[in-house]
Curated annotation (Swiss-Prot):
Residues 174-176 are annotated as: G5. The lineage of its organism: Bacteria, Pseudomonadati, Pseudomonadota, Gammaproteobacteria, Oceanospirillales. Monomer. This is Elongation factor Tu. It comes from Alcanivorax borkumensis (strain ATCC 700651 / DSM 11573 / NCIMB 13689 / SK2). Its EC number is 3.6.5.3.
Length: 396
């Protein structure tokens, strides 16, 4: 039992299974935990323990998600699996489970199906950077040519959505056989090969602290004789005393200098990702900065008003709208710490959007917000959340 000892200093990578219903996502998830436990140590999780996914509430949205963990020799993986298609849509749009890479499970017996396509599209929209394919149920296909045909179809589908289809790793196997302990090529070795492929193909994610500094502003105070202090939680990067920073969003971008960082009334020489701090700004007046703006490393983020969004509209049961909305709908968009009104343009041919739907739409805000692709937001009406979305692509 010597291999039970976990190394907690390994890099953490977040992954998840995506793909059409009944193509074997949950079976593969269980097989991954079993194979990793047997080969490299750790704990296996049974199929039932994953399939009965607990419901969680993320921004008021009910999402059923299973979380499992497994280890390769060099990494610790946190893996999400969802029981239903609607759960995937909600999960990916809210960013409840941000993925560094996804495992697309496709049945070799059926080939790509509607949700295969939809999950690839969602991955593109919400910014999942890498996809690895597991061609499942390979034991049910005797004809090698048929396997190759399905592989080609999957590669074409990935390329359709700007993933590198020709270079995407595809592993053929049987998740069920692997889960049963089968040691033939398509059983446990195929799943082991999948994990080794994740190790090689998905790069180690950059830690928040190594990214360019960004802090959403929550509050603004003026301290007599010292100047203006803004408070908030540092989202990423580090701000050091003496560094030049920009104030971005709502108004024209301005430059200032950080002349002090405080945490719990103690003076620090820097504020780091994850910390709640007060930042003292040189020469900035109390009325020149407000909640909803961000402090950022100069040049690292710009303000925008127009973008394409992928949106999930809450159902009535989730406390959302009871009625559909139409083209020209003008709700508030809640970014980080503030609401901004925006107008929605629906895709051509879409008359209306019903509660419980997901939709791609064009949005134009009445004031610019510091944004980049992948930024999450809530849609609100009078302070009540009626939707969740992600910036798929900035247009202006």
């Amino acid at each position: 039992m010597a291999k039970e000892k976990f190394e907690r200093n390994k890099p953490h990578v977040n992954v998840g299974t995506i793909g059409h219903v009944d193509h074997g996502k949950t079976t593969l998830t269980a097989a991954l935990t079993r194979v990793c436990a047997e080969v490299w140590g750790g704990n296996a999780v049974a199929f039932d323990g994953i399939d009965n996914a607990p419901e969680e509430r993320e921004r008021g949205i009910t999402i059923a998600t299973s979380h499992v963990e497994y280890d390769s020799p060099t990494r610790h993986y946190a893996h999400v699996d969802c029981p239903g298609h609607a759960d995937y849509v909600k999960n990916m749009i809210t960013g409840a489970a941000q993925m560094d890479g996804a495992i697309l499970v496709c049945s070799a017996a059926d080939g790509p199906m509607p949700q295969t396509r939809e999950h690839i599209l969602l991955s593109r929209q919400v910014g999942v950077p890498y996809i690895v394919v597991f061609l499942n149920k390979a034991d049910m296909v005797d004809d090698e040519e048929l396997l190759e045909l399905v592989e080609m179809e999957v590669r074409e589908l990935l390329s359709d959505y700007d993933f590198p289809g020709d270079d995407t790793p595809i592993i053929k196997g049987s998740a069920l056989k692997a889960l049963e302990g089968d040691t033939s090529d398509i059983g446990m070795p195929a799943v082991q090969k999948l994990v080794e492929t994740l190790d090689e193909y998905i790069p180690e994610p950059e830690r928040a602290v190594d990214q360019p500094f960004l802090m959403p502003i929550e509050d603004v105070f003026s301290i007599s004789g010292r100047g203006t202090v803004v408070t908030g939680r540092v989202e990423r990067g580090i701000v050091k005393v003496g560094e030049e920073i920009e104030i971005v969003g709502i108004h024209d971008t301005t430059k200032t200098t950080c002349t002090g960082v405080e945490m719990f009334r103690k003076l620090l020489d820097e504020g780091r990702a994850g910390e709640n701090v007060g930042v003292l700004l040189r020469g900035t007046k109390r009325d020149e900065v407000e909640r909803g703006q961000v402090l950022a490393k100069p040049g690292s983020i710009n303000p925008h008003t127009k973008f394409v969004a992928e949106v999930y509209v809450l159902s009535k049961d989730e406390g959302g709208r009871h009625t559909p909305f139409f083209n020209g709908y003008r709700p508030q968009f809640y970014f980080r710490t503030t609401d901004v009104t925006g107008a929605c343009t629906l895709p051509e041919g879409t008359e209306m959007v019903m509660p419980g739907d997901n939709v791609q739409m064009d949005v134009e805000l009445i004031a610019p917000i510091a944004m980049e692709d992948g930024l999450r937001f809530a849609i609100r009406e009078g302070g009540r959340t009626v939707g969740a979305g992600v910036v798929a692509k900035i247009t202006e």
